[in-house]
């Protein structure tokens, strides 16, 4: 008996995705990739002027939504803003985040508070804003950018690692709560990616990483997200971990 393998369906025609932290890095590359698959995409970021320039370049299926995720009232109105622009929502990607590394004994707790608020509280609040809508329509995908630090404690970034462990806990408890409604929740967990989040890396560490190939490009993450949200509705990709070959974690 012959078995044929059909080509992977990656069409998002008729779907609407919304992505936080979409003005640069992983978020912007995910926006480009989902647009290329036929989706309409709402790019969410606090940098309104930059967003407007980007959507003009990206075309008529890209929409700008300026939101400061550190402001609770703006996050609480997130769904309303998305629906006003596009009329629907199928995919929500909680991608925005901040990075902090270094020894705990030398850290600034005020900086920690800002990082933890964005990576944890704001991300969870975003999901709270959009989740009832997805439950009501009995379909949808929520994706988190959780990074490898969400499953492997990384010694040089304790606070950041802790924030991503919190994200992973939220992802998989929420996933189990909402699966019954046809809503899928998953996380993409990349290793080091060339983005603005690595601006705090010491120059010597960055130069070494670029030289030895231990950094990935954002497109690697974007293609994984596309894979996750285009699977058959009876399948959930709960985690995708992607590492450069030379990263020993």
From Swiss-Prot:
The keyword Zinc-finger does not apply. PROSITE patterns: ADH_SHORT. The active site is at 160 (proton acceptor). It is an enzyme of class 1 (oxidoreductase). InterPro entries: NAD(P)-bd_dom_sf (IPR036291), Sc_DH/Rdtase_CS (IPR020904), SDR_fam (IPR002347). Keywords: NAD, Oxidoreductase. GO terms for cellular component: membrane. It catalyses: ribitol + NAD(+) = D-ribulose + NADH + H(+). It comes from the Bacteria. One of its GO terms (molecular function) is ribitol 2-dehydrogenase (NAD+) activity. NAD(+) binds at residues 20-43. Coiled coil: none annotated. The keyword Secreted does not apply. Pfam families: adh_short (PF00106). Its EC number is 1.1.1.56. Homotetramer. The sequence shown is that of strain A. Belongs to the short-chain dehydrogenases/reductases (SDR) family. This is Ribitol 2-dehydrogenase. The lineage of its organism: Bacteria, Pseudomonadati, Pseudomonadota, Gammaproteobacteria, Enterobacterales.
């Amino acid at each position: 008996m012959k078995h044929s393998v059909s080509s992977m369906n990656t069409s998002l025609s008729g779907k609407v995705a919304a992505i936080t932290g979409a003005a640069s890095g992983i978020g912007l590359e995910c926006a480009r990739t989902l647009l290329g698959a036929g989706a309409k995409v709402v790019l969410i970021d606090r940098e309104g002027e930059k967003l407007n320039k980007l959507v003009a370049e990206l075309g008529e299926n890209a929409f700008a939504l300026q939101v400061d995720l550190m402001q609770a009232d703006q996050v609480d109105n997130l769904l309303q803003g998305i629906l006003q622009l596009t009329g629907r929502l199928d995919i929500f990607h909680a991608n925005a985040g901040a990075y902090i590394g270094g020894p705990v004994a030398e850290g600034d707790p005020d900086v920690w508070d800002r990082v933890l608020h964005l990576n944890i509280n704001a991300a969870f609040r975003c999901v709270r804003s959009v989740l009832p809508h997805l439950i009501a329509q009995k379909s949808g995908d929520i994706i988190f950018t959780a990074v490898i630090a969400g499953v492997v404690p990384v010694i040089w970034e304790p606070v950041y690692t802790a924030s991503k462990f919190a994200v992973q806990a939220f992802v998989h408890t929420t996933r189990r709560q909402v699966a019954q409604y046809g809503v899928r929740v998953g996380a993409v967990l990349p290793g080091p990616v060339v983005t603005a989040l690595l601006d705090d890396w010491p120059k010597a560490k960055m130069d070494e990483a670029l030289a030895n190939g231990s950094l990935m490009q954002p497109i690697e993450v974007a293609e994984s997200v596309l894979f996750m949200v285009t699977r058959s509705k009876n399948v959930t990709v709960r985690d995708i971990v992607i590492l450069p070959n030379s990263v020993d974690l």
